[in-house]
Amino acid sequence: MELAASPDAMLKWLSDAGLAEPPILSQIKARWKAAPREADALLETAVELREALYELFIARIDGRKADPAAAKTVNRHLSGSQAGSGLALSHTTFRWQRPAGKLAPEALLRPIAWSAAGLLTGPRAQKLKQCQDQRGCGWLFIDESRAQNRRWCTMGDCGNLAKSRRHYHRAKAGART
């Protein structure tokens, strides 16, 4: 969701994350053609939820009390319900099922809030970490490493940059001596 800069990009992210089926997305896109402001409003709501979740996750990582406004935002998403929504079996996996007909677009965000709440209240919450890249990456991850000592969001991005920076500075310091 971090890179979803437009309503269409947000719908693609929701689809890629398995949170919205193509018929639902088509229904919402058609609705947005008639009411484009609704698309922008949902994107604003999604960004608001993302920022609230980030605050809660960072508070958990830092061991501090979270901003009550962030918890209130997430709780607002947790408390809503859409009759007929639930889990559907898809071969050997599960996916979110939405009712046909009128779907409140903000209901697409509900599984995100539920998943985050499950993470924050479950045993994996203690494995939640923030990337330690010096450029200020800020991405969050769950440290599943055996020693619980992972430092970067990905080794391919921030990890390699940090290691190459460290190597450069060591080589530069060695050249001076």
Go through each PLM region and give its residues.
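A generic structural signal for secondary-structure junctions
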Residues: 15, 169-172
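Alpha-helix termini
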Residues: 31, 167-169
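Short helix-coil boundary/hinge micro-motifs
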Residues: 1-130, 177
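BZIP DNA-binding basic region
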Residues: 107-165, 172-177
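Intrinsically disordered, low-complexity regions enriched in small/polar residues
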Residues: 96-98, 143, 170
